């Protein structure tokens, strides 16, 4: 059964009020002065004789599209995507694996075994809901809290843990901070820390794909509500709209930009309201509902492949601390965290949905959690034993052919280490 959401796609009666999904805001009422329309190149709009300043209250709020309620029940059967069993189980097992990896690697950092970590608690539904609706050939520009997308696409726990430990098998050669993953094989562009830099890059990549004859790929760009406050976000939105790029802009609005709540980040109706203002089809979705996210991204991908950019604001809650460098209880009450953990868990919602379909039970849950935990523990123990990359990796593989300036530095470093090797833990690194 085809999904139909949006102005010409909504068929759910209870969501008639949500007819702006993947479209534009309700326009404020205007009084036409004789039907005269302006001919200004900057805006073709009707003339009025009554002056009126518009604000955030001049428009209806963009509604939140959802498929499941808090208990994992389908609200309207017509919106159930009816995903096949194998895909549903892959989605759920990915969420469980991610949760176990987060728990163990977070504690690993606390024990001093890795330098840094960021968890994904509360946002797992956004990861698997979106990943399951994309083609593996679609290009991913992520921020730093989308690991579930990588797991769903086939990146292994070994690859992810090696990256966090920065050993010689780290695909990034030990050059990045932990959780800054990337994989050319899985069409995932390497993560960088500065907020929002990936947004105009993603749109540029989408523009390049658009120019490929018979293109069948789109780009999805993940970013948070904090990144949406950066100037690069506006540039990316406008770039995508004016050049009709095949891109999905996926905002994870989890309520906090480190310690800054959304109430201090913006006025108006959230991040989603910026889409219609710039001419981008927009939908706001319940990010704790993996099925709703799947539906939204599946339809958004269809639009993107027709060179119609889409903005999705996935509403969620960051259950964990921003990172291991943060203590979120200093700026939000513990009761708030507990409420969201108990009542709006994306993992729990999907598990209850699977149980009602007869795809899951308590024994399967116990076995899945055990296997996920054992995989991470075993991989972590192996990663710790591996040596760090050869020191020459600092200088190699930067240019295709090493320029004389870098060759000179390498020679100097080599002589220095020969002379002062006792001052460096060279046994911990690979050597020739």
Model-derived features: positions:
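A short, flexible beta-alpha/helix-coil linker loop
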Residues: 73-74, 147, 254-257
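Residue-level detector of short coil/turn "hinge" positions at structural boundaries
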Residues: 75, 115, 125, 282, ...
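Cofactor-binding active-site loop characterized by glycine-rich and histidine/acidic residues
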Residues: 100-103, 107-243, 261-272, 277-279
